[in-house]
């Protein structure tokens, strides 16, 4: 969790970070493989998801 940084003026909640790391660990990822947890809205990611869903 040392890679957690402030985004949009707010520090990420430790509970939220713990849940995300736990979910990724349950999927087989180690904590060393997690580079960033960024709560940034990216409209490009949304559009890419929509385009992939239409395929």
Swiss-Prot record:
A single GO CC term, please? plasma membrane
* Activity control mechanisms: Completely inhibited by avidin.
UniProt catalytic activity: (S)-methylmalonyl-CoA + Na(+)(in) + H(+)(out) = propanoyl-CoA + Na(+)(out) + CO2
Q: Where are the transmembrane segments?
A: none
Explain the consequences of disrupting this gene: Deletion of the gene does not abolish methylmalonyl-CoA-decarboxylase or Na(+) transport activity, but it affects the stability of the complex, especially the binding of the alpha subunit. Mutant lacking this gene plus the 3'-terminal half of the mmdD gene lacks methylmalonyl-CoA decarboxylase activity.
Per the UniProt record, which EC number(s) apply here?
7.2.4.3
User: Which cysteines link up through disulfide bonds?
Assistant: none
Q: Which UniProt keywords apply?
A: Cell membrane, Ion transport, Membrane, Sodium, Sodium transport, Translocase, Transport
Say if the entry is tagged with keyword Membrane.
yes
Keyword Translocase tagged? yes
In Gene Ontology terms, what is a biological process of this protein?
sodium ion transport
Subcellular compartments: Cell membrane
What binding partners and quaternary form does the record give? The methylmalonyl-CoA decarboxylase is composed of five subunits: the carboxyltransferase alpha subunit (MmdA), the tunnel beta subunit (MmdB), the biotin-containing gamma subunit (MmdC), and the delta (MmdD) and epsilon (MmdE) subunits.
Known role: Subunit of the sodium ion pump methylmalonyl-CoA decarboxylase, which converts the chemical energy of a decarboxylation reaction into an electrochemical gradient of Na(+) ions across the cytoplasmic membrane, thereby creating a sodium ion motive force that is used for ATP synthesis. The epsilon subunit seems not important for the catalysis of either decarboxylation or Na(+) transport, but it improves binding of the alpha subunit and plays an important role in stabilizing the methylmalonyl-CoA-decarboxylase enzyme complex. Can also convert malonyl-CoA into acetyl-CoA.
Q: Could you tell me what this protein is called?
A: Methylmalonyl-CoA decarboxylase subunit epsilon
